[in-house]
Amino acid sequence: MRSVSINSARLVLVYPLMQQTDHAYTEAHIAAYPVEYIAGIDLYNSGEFHAAHDAWEERWMGEVGPQEKLFLQAMIQSAVAFHHMDIGRPGAARQMYQRAKEKFAKLGCSVFMSLDLDDYQAQLDAALSWLLTAADPRTLPMPEIRAPKIRLLPAIDVFD
């Protein structure tokens, strides 16, 4: 088991990786991908959506390629959509959900950094598409939603 420490002006995060029991990723993923990406997955899968946003944003703000930047923006916005749902702001959640969908569409691929984007987006739509059914989602009763669980595919992708 390995610990991760992410430090920035806004974020200090230290916890052991691979602590989760659902095996969202492998040791090969830990070795291949940025620690902020893996940390964000742990946090997201734990329902810590704002903290997942912080971890992914730490990576996004660094020097990354254009595809990775777009992917991280989509992941950040999807996490923020669930954060807004948690705090009772469906209008803001809808805005973040729409932005995430746009970013995923611009990526133009079905797998990125071992995440099956088609599956993730299908789960995202199942959880949040109801937000698009009203002119003002604040007027709708909030259903019980389940955020997608992120589980990386076994193959390691080359990313920019």
Q: Where in the sequence are the language-model features?
A:
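TPR/TPR-like (Sel1-like) alpha-helical repeat modules
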Residues: 90-108
